[in-house]
Amino acid sequence: MDTMRISGVSTGAEVLIQCNSLSSLVSRRCDDGKWRTRMFPARNRDLRPSPTRRSFLSVKSISSEPKAKVTDAVLDSEQEVFISSMNPFAPDAASVASSIKYHAEFTPLFSPEKFELPKAFFATAQSVRDALIMNWNATYEYYNRVNVKQAYYLSMEFLQGRALSNAVGNLGLNSAYGDALKRLGFDLESVASQEPDPALGNGGLGRLASCFLDSMATLNYPAWGYGLRYKYGLFKQRITKDGQEEAAEDWLELSNPWEIVRNDVSYPIKFYGKVVFGSDGKKRWIGGEDIVAVAYDVPIPGYKTKTTINLRLWSTKAPSEDFDLSSYNSGKHTEAAEALFNAEKICFVLYPGDESTEGKALRLKQQYTLCSASLQDIVARFETRSGGNVNWEEFPEKVAVQMNDTHPTLCIPELMRILMDLKGLSWEDAWKITQRTVAYTNHTVLPEALEKWSLELMEKLLPRHVEIIEKIDEELVRTIVSEYGTADPDLLEEKLKAMRILENVELPSAFADVIVKPVNKPVTAKDAQNGVKTEQEEEKTAGEEEEDEVIPEPTVEPPKMVRMANLAVVGGHAVNGVAEIHSEIVKQDVFNDFVQLWPEKFQNKTNGVTPRRWIRFCNPYLSDIITNWIGTEDWVLNTEKVAELRKFADNEDLQSEWRAAKKKNKLKVVSLIKERTGYTVSPDAMFDIQIKRIHEYKRQLLNILGIVYRYKKMKEMSASEREKAFVPRVCIFGGKAFATYVQAKRIVKFITDVASTINHDPEIGDLLKVIFVPDYNVSVAELLIPASELSQHISTAGMEASGTSNMKFSMNGCVLIGTLDGANVEIREEVGEENFFLFGAKADQIVNLRKERAEGKFVPDPTFEEVKKFVGSGVFGSNSYDELIGSLEGNEGFGRADYFLVGKDFPSYIECQEKVDEAYRDQKRWTRMSIMNTAGSFKFSSDRTIHEYAKDIWNIKQVELP
């Protein structure tokens, strides 16, 4: 029998059987009915690799390649391992240990002398990846064969978190890998902790995208994710005496063991240039700057399923011919490599600073790169599956494109460009296809987050796309005029101003005269008697005043902008909000004019989070309790079963186990805090946590001012009075402030100053500690959330679209304090009003409250004035907080007048915190509240959300592999 042996550049997953590729491996067995591999060397060999074998893997495609016979003296016929065809990567511990040792030797990233934790992690990850590749190839070979409709999820962020524990857990290989690593002198948890968090996202937007991918795979939906491969991420946060400092992320410094570079999957991306007519009469975009987007694939495994989907990340580079060798050899090294740098920098940093024109251009390049590369790839895959008979009308029947916020909105003109300019379709046909294919998820009601781009910049950078956008805008104007007519010019003008894609741009020439307002009537003698000046009197008055005429200041023309949210609404077939209250605000306020025109487009899809990562894997203590008490582990896939805990909420045995699990998780956080900050905290104190992006609307400022008030009151009491009045608390913050967001960075600085003062006050001791955990990420969240007892979700009502951390906290038995905002509303409904601490103004009150403030009618509460005065007393150091506290002062002006209503909600917040203390003193009551939160969180699984997207927006079906 012909065999193929593993070479030093192998993954270790190639078969040594009569099969010619990974694709054929997963589609058929060999003659004897078994899968045979030489993956795991049987002998206990020295781990020093041969120098000639130190090559890195580059799997270029999943297509079959010609058979090959390569000999390797290291492996002989006695070393074959027979693995079951159902799960070829579910071997025993001995086989897994051999696999890990194999990768330590033959896919090394470290020197061969020592086999220590970092090397153990990479070898283990490569071993697990072998399993993923097998299932991954099986998944897409089957999808290609049955040619199913597929969803493509485009997002600027994917905040994945560590992959090793998640992959091993989803594959059901915890025991095998745990035992194997013990044989090698390691434990799985320590090895997994070596993995850096991928720096591909920042906040809830990216984490939601990653939860969705997990659910898509777990539920067997055919789907891909598309994003960018950021070399340095957002930034690594350091906390110093000056507050937050930013440094480049180094997550790729030792490479990423999960990704597979697809050098054969690359697409040209163009910027600048000009638009001309080709010889066929069709428009062509030529000249300008050309770069290449290269695919890096990351397998995403489902839980207890063979389905493994793909996250395709794009990296950018310049074509080799753009390297100016002549300039380089003449000593002009920087000039020679300029094109290379300009291409590569597109994927350097997530959300580069955009205060400069160059920064804005870079961000726009990022967004277009994501859209263009992804759509070229999607179109190519559609054509391949269609064979030689491509019917473009079927494109929306095979492809669904979901835009995660407005960042990928250039998908709309880009798909139009591809269909018209490259595939020869008419405008009408291309527009119908585009609208049926694309859908848009709105994530915000904040005006600054509803993206707008300078028309001038876009015309320069993407001239063909601006032509297409102008045409879409013209068609929109035609629709608006047709809908509202010209009888009421004021109404028509109002609608056009609100709904057009192009802002502050003259109407298209075809509609230049559509708004005709009545001319003023001539003044009659009767008018003159009533005090109205005649034309002659006006001329006389004007003549008398000519001598005193003042030349007016020149009017500054407002900038011409492209409104991406409007383009997303017009160009797609569905628009969804991400929580019930948010979707109502979207319909009633943000896009109300569009709702009146196309009500069928708008819907709600309340966010969710994956219960695999956010309970099952990050909180094994709680997971075991849930499984034991409801009698099945099926809740991991069917979270509605968690609701069965409600009937045991008062059971003393359950409550005792529940508190013990929480204590174990708190002890882990005690160690984390000591390691990251140097502070020692008591595990017996309440853990009060707010971890999220630092932003004024999320109101970390309200939280820390509440802590300041608490501290002030403590200082006014004797020791015995303090202990009687207050429950011991550890108040934990985490989150990053954008590098250019000055006010958010001031909040970080203020929190750390308050922490330094309180934590070093011997009178307070363990009664109150304030901790800011630096460089917050998914891995930190996986420790903090299971240990949390109170979590703060206190945004100004109506400003948080949904939030997902509130769901994670609730799942883990944490009681929430918050406003009626975002998903808080639905969480409170599910867990019970008595198990949620509610305070603050409601969303429908906010406009009037701001109006009252502007009119000088707001009277601040004395406690709020007391706190501000205390902050200004210098108790927290010599730093000035005038700018920070000044934002809470006055009645009008940019950056003032307490826009986020911290002062308005402060007394309600303090009163609510007193109720928290009261409830926590009764541990039986508190534990019941905790259990009811977990039991009521079942709705907030991303599995439910993805089922809704699949049914209502994407129209895709679940596809189980045979």
Swiss-Prot record:
- What GO terms are given for molecular function? 1,4-alpha-oligoglucan phosphorylase activity; glycogen phosphorylase activity; pyridoxal phosphate binding
Keywords of the record:
Allosteric enzyme, Carbohydrate metabolism, Chloroplast, Glycosyltransferase, Plastid, Pyridoxal phosphate, Transferase, Transit peptide
Name the InterPro entries on file: Glycg_phsphrylas, Glyco_trans_35, Pyridoxal_P_attach_site
| Residue interval of the organelle targeting sequence | 1-63
Signal is among the record's keywords: no
Query: EC number(s) for this protein?
Result: 2.4.1.1
Write down the Pfam families for this protein, in alphabetical order: Phosphorylase (PF00343)
Q: Where is the signal peptide?
A: none
Sorted alphabetically, the Gene Ontology BP terms of this entry are: carbohydrate metabolic process; response to temperature stimulus; response to water deprivation
Q: Where in the cell is it found?
A: Plastid, Chloroplast stroma
Record PTM N6-(pyridoxal phosphate)lysine, positions in chain: K808
Q: Where is this region: Disordered?
A: 525-552
Catalyzed reactions per annotation = [(1->4)-alpha-D-glucosyl](n) + phosphate = [(1->4)-alpha-D-glucosyl](n-1) + alpha-D-glucose 1-phosphate
Q: Name one GO cellular component term.
A: chloroplast stroma
- Consequence of gene loss (knockout): Small white lesions on the tips or margins of fully expanded leaves.
Q: What is its main location?
A: plastid
Per its UniProt record, the required cofactor names are:
pyridoxal 5'-phosphate
Which superkingdom? Eukaryota
Q: Which family does it belong to?
A: Belongs to the glycogen phosphorylase family.
Job description of the protein: Phosphorylase is an important allosteric enzyme in carbohydrate metabolism. Enzymes from different sources differ in their regulatory mechanisms and in their natural substrates. However, all known phosphorylases share catalytic and structural properties. May be not required for the degradation of starch, but the phosphorolysis of starch may play an important role in water stress tolerance.
Q: What is this protein called?
A: Alpha-glucan phosphorylase 1
> Species name for this entry?
Arabidopsis thaliana (Mouse-ear cress)
Provide the taxonomic classification.
Eukaryota, Viridiplantae, Streptophyta, Embryophyta, Tracheophyta
